[in-house]
Amino acid sequence: MRSDRSRKRFVFLCVAPATILFFIFMILPTLNVFRMSLYERGAYSPNETFVGLKNFQHLLKDTQFIRSMQNMILLVVVVTIITFAFALVFAAILTREKIKGQNFFRIIFYIPNILSVVVISGIFSAIYKPENGMLNSILGLFRDMTDPILWKGEKLVIPSIIIAMVWQAVGYYMVMYMASMSSVPASLYESANLDGAGRLTQFFQITIPLVWTNIRTTLTFFIISTINMAFLFVKAMTSGGPNGASDVALNYMYSQKDAGLYGYSMAIGVVIFLFSFALSACVNRATSREPLEF
C-alpha cells in the first residue's frame, strides 16, 4: 500500500513540471488567441474593443485571405502526396534491390533535411533566377531564352515552392520507411515470388500494409508540419509575392499583425488552428485500419 502511494507520488512529481510548462506555454497562449480574436485592438494601444465575431465575418469577405488559404491547402495536399510517394518508392528500391552503396544514397537523400529553410530557399532562388539561374541556363541550350522563364512569377511560383519543399522533406521520410521495410521478413517476399506475385504487387500487398502504422503516424505529423514549413519557405523565398500569388495563411496572419490589426490576425490564427485540428482528425479517421503483424 505504501509502495503504491510512493509510486504514484513519484509519477506525479515527474509529470507535474512538464504539465505545468505545457499549460503555461501552450494552453494559455492558445486560449488567449481565441479571446483576442473577439476583440479589436490597435498596434500601440492597450485598449481593446469587444467586436464578437466581426473579425471572422471580415475573413469571409477578404479575398486575399481566401487566396492564402487556397495556396496553403494546395501546398499541403500536393507536397504531402509527392513527398510520400517518392519516399516510399525510394525506400522500397534501396531496401529490396540491394543496391551497392545503400548507406551513401541514404546520406545523400537525407542531407537536405539537415539544411535550414533559409539555406534551401537560397539554393532554389539561385536556381530559379531568370537571367543566370541553372534552370534557364539549361533550357537555353535547347530553346531561345530571349524572354526568360519567371520561375518565381505569378504562374509558376507555387510549383517552384513545391519542388523546394519536396526536396527538403523526402530524404527524412525515406530513411524512416527504409527502417520499417528492412524489418519485413524476406520469407514473405519469397513466398510471394513462388505464388507469381510481381514487384508491384508485393509492394502494395505486402510492404505497404506491413509499414502502414509508420506511414499513418508520419503522415499526420507531416501534414501539420507542412502548414508551418509552407510559411517558412514562402517567407524566405518570396515573402508572399509577387502580388500575393504565393501568400499562405500564416504569412498573411503575420502581415496583418504587422499592420496593427491584432484582433484580425488572431482570428486568422484561430481559423488555421481549427483547420489543422480538423485536418489531422480527418487524416487519422481516413487512415485507420487494423494493424498487420508478421
Spell out what each predicted region is.
Residues 2-294:
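A structural signal for multi-pass alpha-helical bundles of membrane permease subunits
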